[in-house]
């Protein structure tokens, strides 16, 4: 009986050691930006974010009142001209800035939209920071979209009102790890979560690669860095376009420049 107990104890210890080693090996295989608790972090050697900084709407609004918030009339292109220009260029390649981080990029037969935000406010409530100017187009005025790129989950980039009301839910969605649920829940059928350096070939001329950025993610008090963030490299017919996430500086950009900018 004593020998039987010893055998059980030894087996338990062996199982524990094997499990521990398996977990260790699994984590060793994961890239640096994957943290063991399931969150993400910036590329190795990136500047550290100051976690002691506290955001305050009171301070923000106080400082904002000191600024001249008047937008020069010539800064905003008239709606008629925007629609006219897009109509003239419908058979050409173009990049159109809609506002903030929202661009419409037409390359061949593929039309891309980036971080579309058509709401008046950026935040979980209607009282979030308000945009200075309206987007160049309304959501129901944009051309047919084939490819939807999302860099990260901050409210001024991942706008749930726009995602829910987006008129082209058959578009291919490309976005960081762990953000797909926001789209599948809202009727999108072609949702592709991507890790850094993942690439997807759209057609013979067009390829999209998801690249590292020096940033972070957060939409609530409890989800800091639980979803990934990043940049998109758009390669089309020998040309390269980098659509950058909100990003700080970091050594990673020297590496990306050396490896991707050729």
What are these regions (language model features)?
Residues 4-12, 16-141, 234-245:
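Metallo-beta-lactamase
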Residues 22-23, 27-43, 138, 147, ...:
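Cap/insert and terminal regions of metallo-dependent hydrolase folds
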Residues 105, 115, 152, 159, ...:
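Divalent metal-coordination and catalytic microenvironments
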Residues 127-175, 190, 259-262:
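Active-site metal-binding motif and surrounding structural segment of the metallo-beta-lactamase
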Residues 154-158, 180-182, 198-201, 216-218, ...:
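Active-site environment of divalent metal-dependent phosphoester hydrolases
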Residues 161, 216-262:
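Active-site-proximal loop/helix segments of hydrolase catalytic cores
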Residues 183-195:
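Helix-loop-beta element that forms the nucleotide-linked donor phosphate-binding surface
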Residues 192, 199-221, 225:
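Flexible, acidic/histidine-containing loops and adjacent segments that form or flank the divalent-metal
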């Amino acid at each position: 009986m004593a020998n039987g107990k010893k055998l059980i104890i030894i087996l338990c210890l062996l199982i524990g050691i094997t499990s521990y080693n398996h977990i260790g090996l699994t984590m060793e295989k994961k890239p640096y930006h994957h943290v063991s608790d399931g969150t993400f972090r910036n590329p190795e050697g990136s500047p550290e974010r100051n976690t002691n900084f506290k955001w305050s709407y009171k301070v923000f609004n106080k400082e904002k009142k000191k600024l001249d918030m008047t937008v020069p009339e010539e800064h905003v292109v008239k709606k008629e001209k925007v629609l006219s220009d897009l109509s003239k260029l419908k058979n050409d390649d173009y990049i159109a800035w809609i506002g903030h981080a929202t661009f419409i990029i037409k390359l061949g037969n593929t039309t891309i939209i980036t971080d579309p935000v058509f709401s008046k406010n950026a935040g979980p409530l209607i009282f979030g920071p308000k945009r200075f100017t309206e987007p160049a187009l309304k959501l129901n005025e944009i051309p047919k979209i084939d490819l939807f790129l999302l860099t990260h989950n901050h409210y001024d980039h991942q706008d749930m009102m726009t995602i829910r009301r987006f008129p082209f839910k058959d578009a291919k969605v490309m976005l960081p790890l762990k953000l797909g649920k926001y789209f599948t829940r809202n009727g999108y059928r072609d949702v592709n979560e991507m890790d850094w350096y993942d690439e997807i070939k759209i057609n013979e001329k067009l390829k999209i690669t998801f690249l590292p950025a020096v940033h972070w993610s957060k939409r609530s008090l409890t989800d800091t860095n639980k979803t990934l963030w990043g940049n998109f490299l758009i390669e089309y017919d020998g040309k390269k376009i980098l659509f950058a996430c909100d990003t700080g500086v970091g050594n990673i950009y020297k590496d990306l420049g050396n490896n991707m900018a050729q």
